[in-house]
């Protein structure tokens, strides 16, 4: 199986790539969980290179269409994109595996590093270990910005939208959701009034480069499991509510509402719904709650946690796992003999309640998005 898996990236440009088994996809998503450095830009670039260019599991048009949806959702867009593609290829179980493996290695790594940090105080040593990674991470981000920009900004109008968005967010401090909604409105109207400009497949030069036929190609019919059905939407909503409510109810019944575990779960549920614009946009909210309101971490520990989050694989918002571990450990919520266990449980709870909404957004909204992949009003950037 290892030979089969490794042969997949070397698909020739001619002909369609072979079907991807669930096991092949499993090993890819596991690998991605360990190499997804560089924040969302770097992670999306890795997925584009592996899934669009090398393996051709999905065409660029369908990849960008899925990415457009993930960009307007709260939560980590790279992880949501992995869930979306995994779901498109292998139904619900594919999405669950892709999204879980995207986060799980980072959770284990951060639990281990958080324990070393709080138990031994060897942050300089940890920083030294990861210091050499930082230039590579920077290079990945710069390369990702160039790759995505050169392929998405295909004419002067789209460059103007990008420039206006840049000025709005950096010079005028316009909230990120308003920028995204504004760009979406321009794309929607442009797709109706000037389709030749806003067509995703348009453009000139290198932007029109084809990577060959893909498993999920531009005109591949939507698979049966991805067709929108009301009963499926209701089913996902009910299951999602159940997966949130049962752990929360158990925490309240076991520990009470004011316990650290319960308060962390409730706080990071709210934080998960506010993460428009990525981790940096929600960090002030997390800082205010974790440092000022609940005392789960100090200001210095928050900064150190962000440094660890930036130099480990996985979404940058995984810094919340560090906050959870520190809070559970310092508060000794399971007693002085179980400090590590308290930290690990807190980190796991925080991760569960932070990322659960992402799975629900994709599994519930994915069929609606798939129904628009050939509709110019919704594919226009």
Language-model features: where?
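Multi-pass membrane proteins that catalyze or facilitate reactions on polyprenyl-/lipid-phosphate substrates
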Residues: 1-73, 84-312, 316-380
């Amino acid at each position: 199986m290892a030979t089969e898996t490794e042969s997949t990236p070397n698909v020739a440009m001619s002909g369609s790539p072979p079907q991807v088994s669930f096991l092949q996809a499993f090993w890819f998503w596991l690998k991605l969980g360990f190499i997804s450095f560089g924040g969302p830009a770097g992670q999306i670039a890795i997925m584009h290179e592996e899934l669009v260019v090398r393996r051709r599991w999905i065409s660029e048009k369908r990849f960008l269409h899925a990415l457009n949806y993930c960009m307007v959702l709260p939560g980590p867009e790279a992880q949501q994109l992995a869930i979306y593609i995994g779901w498109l290829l292998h139904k619900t179980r594919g999405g669950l595996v892709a999204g879980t493996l995207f986060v799980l290695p980072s959770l284990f790594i951060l639990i281990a590093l958080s324990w070393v940090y709080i138990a031994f105080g060897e942050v300089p040593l940890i920083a030294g270990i990861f210091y050499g990674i930082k230039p590579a991470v920077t290079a990945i981000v710069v390369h990702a910005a160039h790759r995505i920009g050169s392929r998405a900004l295909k004419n002067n109008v789209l460059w103007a939208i990008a420039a206006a968005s840049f000025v709005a967010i950096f010079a005028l401090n316009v909230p990120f959701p308003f920028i995204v909604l504004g760009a979406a409105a321009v794309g929607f109207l442009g797709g109706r009034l000037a389709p030749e400009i806003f067509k995703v497949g348009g453009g000139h030069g290198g932007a029109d480069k084809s990577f060959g036929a893909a498993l999920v190609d531009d005109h591949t019919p939507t698979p049966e499991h991805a067709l929108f059905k009301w009963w499926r939407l209701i089913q996902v909503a009910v299951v999602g509510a159940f997966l949130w409510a049962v752990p929360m109810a158990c925490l309240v019944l076991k520990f009470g509402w004011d316990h650290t575990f319960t308060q962390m779960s409730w706080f990071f549920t709210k934080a998960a719904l506010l993460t428009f614009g990525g981790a940096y946009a929600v960090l002030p909210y997390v800082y205010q709650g974790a440092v000022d309101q609940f005392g789960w971490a100090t200001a210095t520990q928050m900064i150190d946690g962000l440094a660890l989050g930036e130099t480990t694989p996985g979404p940058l918002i995984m810094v919340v796992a560090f906050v959870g571990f520190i809070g559970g450990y310092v508060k000794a919520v399971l007693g002085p003999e179980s400090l590590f266990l308290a930290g690990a449980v807190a980190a796991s709870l925080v991760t569960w309640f932070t990322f659960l909404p992402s799975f629900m957004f994709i599994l519930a909204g994915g069929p609606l998005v798939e129904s628009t992949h050939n509709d110019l009003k919704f594919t226009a950037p």
